[in-house]
């Protein structure tokens, strides 16, 4: 088992790790994703475990379901069961977010995961994270967008 400095939320059983130094916006973005339907897996410290060829995220038992919200303190939220991680999002300042990201991966416990960089305080950060997680869970994060459109849409163009 590996414990990392990251928050983690899950949507439909698919988890995303939100990484960044203290104050980078991990809990802030996680809270906005929870407001949009995600569930908290872990806040600030995430345990990773390898199961077959899957990486599973969970919360240390002492903080399960607890989220530290700046200005409010610790708040209890609904906690997700351990969830399979499909994506890592590094939280960075706006100038460090590439307009067109190159494919990038990072390994945890010998399992490679796709990585993206996002500005967590951008108004659209939560929807970008949600869309990226959907694409990563389907194995299509770095495919060109037109490859993901239904054929009927491509024919109409």
How would you describe each model-predicted region?
Residues 1-2, 41, 82, 98-99:
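Short solvent-exposed loop/turn micro-motifs enriched in small/polar/acidic residues
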Residues 1-9:
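Pre-Walker A adenine-sensing motif
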Residues 35-93:
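Conserved nucleotide-sensing/catalytic segment adjacent to the nucleotide-binding pocket
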Residues 85-157:
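Conserved NTP phosphate-binding and transfer environment spanning the P-loop NTPase/kinase superfamily
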Residues 3-4, 26-27, 74-76:
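A generic local structural motif
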Residues 9-34:
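Glycine-rich phosphate-binding P-loop
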